[in-house]
Design a protein with these regions (language model features):
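Sec-dependent signal peptide cleavage junction
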Residues: 18-28
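Bacterial N-terminal signal peptides
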Residues: 10-19
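Structural preference for beta-rich elements and adjacent junctions enriched in aromatics
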Residues: 26-261
């Protein structure tokens, strides 16, 4: 009898362990955005950042375009950790990016065909995380990383009712974010990056300026395009935190971000 009880205990323990593993694997992607220090300096260094919570993009399953190009070198070709900070006026993005051919851009290349970071963000904490269509408070922001112009764009073509805020910067040759700042520092195999996006850039006449507060949770995702040679027709790898390019039209595929002190 005692042997049977011990056997059942082992079986139950294994079942519980497997159950916990399954839950962990199915858990949605989530990160924290920490309150920025009052004296933050945008210099490309990440020394002021809390890097305990990152959106990590570094595996083959996250390559959603031209995977053959990425497989040749793997994470050395492109991989990144993205961090987020905030205050009442700005959203801050920091990143450590490995890229063996960084800062590739050519005039006339759209952001999706150049080296560019992409932010997917909801500015409506009350939005249903399971929604499958963009609303006016859902944003796809492109930021070209070329070590010179740092052009930006906002894609709104997928929104049925955009509340008067149309797509801008789709050609990759404009700076559409008023007050935007960007700075990089080269490191072995890549670079570190700091960006500032004023909350006012993600608002309009019918879209109020977002007012973040500790404890709020919103939908978010991150992606990166990687051009290895600035020539028409060359493959441009795309990696996505979500592991799918359907994030372009379906925010239910995004992860989540909680604002913290």
């Amino acid at each position: 009898m005692n042997k049977l009880i011990r056997l059942l205990s082992v079986v139950l323990a294994v079942a519980m362990l497997l159950g916990c593993t399954a839950v962990a694997e199915a858990a949605p992607r989530a990160i924290n955005a920490y309150k920025a220090p009052a004296d933050i300096s945008i210099d490309g260094e990440l020394t002021e950042w809390n890097t305990t919570s990152a959106a990590t993009i570094n595996v083959e399953e996250q390559v959603v375009r031209d995977p053959g190009q990425w497989k040749e070198k793997g994470a050395e070709d492109l991989s990144l950790d993205v961090y987020v900070m905030w205050d009442e006026e700005n959203l801050y993005l920091g990143a450590k990016i490995l890229d063996d051919t960084p800062f590739m851009y050519r005039e006339g290349f759209p952001p999706d065909m150049a080296d560019s970071l992409v932010l997917f963000l909801s500015t409506d904490p009350s939005a249903d995380a399971a929604r499958t269509a963009y609303t006016a408070n859902d944003w796809r922001v492109t930021m070209v990383i070329d070590d010179y112009y740092y052009n930006t764009g906002i894609d709104r073509d997928m929104i049925e009712d955009n509340k008067g805020f149309d797509t801008v910067g789709e050609d990759g040759d404009e700076q559409v974010l008023d007050g935007y700042e960007a700075c990089i520092v080269e490191i072995d195999g890549g670079y570190t990056l700091e960006l500032v996006i004023p909350w006012t850039c993600l608002s309009g006449a019918e879209i109020p300026v977002f007012a973040p507060a500790a404890g709020m949770t919103v939908s978010v995702d991150f992606g990166m395009f990687d051009l290895d040679f600035p020539c028409p027709g060359v493959a441009t790898v795309r990696m996505q935190w979500a592991g799918t390019d359907t994030v372009d039209t379906d925010p239910s595929k995004w992860g989540s971000m909680t604002f913290c002190e």
